[in-house]
């Protein structure tokens, strides 16, 4: 059987050597269950896809408030203050491109069937992070066209909202001690002091 599985959005582009680079990294790091490469927009701008485990406020600010109002919150949530040229152990890696160790998937479980698109990546990354390292690896890169269907389509927005509600119902809305502990540890490791 396969050692690794790749789950990716249809709007992802990458060079053939990307998969080999990620597999080599995973082969050398048996404690890593999931890895995400550096992600760029087609115009070369970086996508900030390393994130803290979200609070309800993080997702509301990010989705519904004007960018300027949520700037400080977004910088912290998306770890924009950190060096995106360095490897990091991140609890929430974007679902746009998930490179997963099959053995780890068997241990933590597959995608939770309650989530159909949106929220499933947060849930799986979190479960994986509890038992394995979940690494951002800038030694490989991809291009994500970022179609952002839930920003353009009312039906997709409603699915997004429903699944985020399901995520918080599963893990906790405001009183999630595990989230608080994981996020505090990561911010400390990244020397966040604002």
Where are these regions (language model features)?
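Short aromatic/hydrophobic "clamp" motif used to bind/position activated sugar donors
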Residues: 5
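Short, flexible, basic/aromatic active-site loop/helix in glycosyltransferases
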Residues: 54-90
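Glycine-rich, basic loop-to-helix element that forms the pyrophosphate-binding segment
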Residues: 1
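Active-site-adjacent helix/loop segment of glycosyltransferases
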Residues: 126, 130-194
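Acidic metal-phosphate-binding loop of nucleotide-sugar-dependent transferases
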Residues: 11-13, 115
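Conserved donor NDP-sugar-binding/catalytic core segment of glycosyltransferases
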Residues: 13-49
């Amino acid at each position: 059987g396969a050692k690794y599985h790749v789950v990716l959005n249809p709007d992802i582009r990458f060079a053939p050597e990307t998969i080999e680079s990620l597999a080599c990294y995973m082969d050398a790091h048996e404690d890593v269950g999931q890895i995400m490469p550096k992600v760029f927009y087609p115009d070369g701008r970086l996508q900030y896809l390393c994130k803290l485990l979200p609070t309800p406020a993080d997702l509301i600010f990010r989705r519904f408030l004007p960018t300027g109002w949520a700037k400080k919150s977004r910088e912290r949530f998306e770890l924009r203050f950190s060096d995106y040229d360095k490897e990091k152990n991140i609890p929430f890696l974007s679902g746009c491109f998930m490179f997963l160790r099959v053995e780890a998937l068997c241990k933590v479980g597959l995608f939770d069937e309650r989530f159909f698109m949106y929220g499933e990546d947060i849930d799986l990354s979190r479960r994986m992070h509890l038992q394995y390292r979940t690494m951002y690896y800038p030694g490989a890169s991809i291009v994500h066209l970022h179609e952002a269907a839930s920003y353009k389509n009312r039906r997709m927005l409603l699915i997004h909202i429903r699944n985020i509600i399901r995520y918080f119902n599963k893990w906790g809305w405001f009183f999630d001690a595990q989230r608080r502990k994981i996020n505090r540890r990561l911010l400390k490791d990244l020397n966040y002091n604002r």
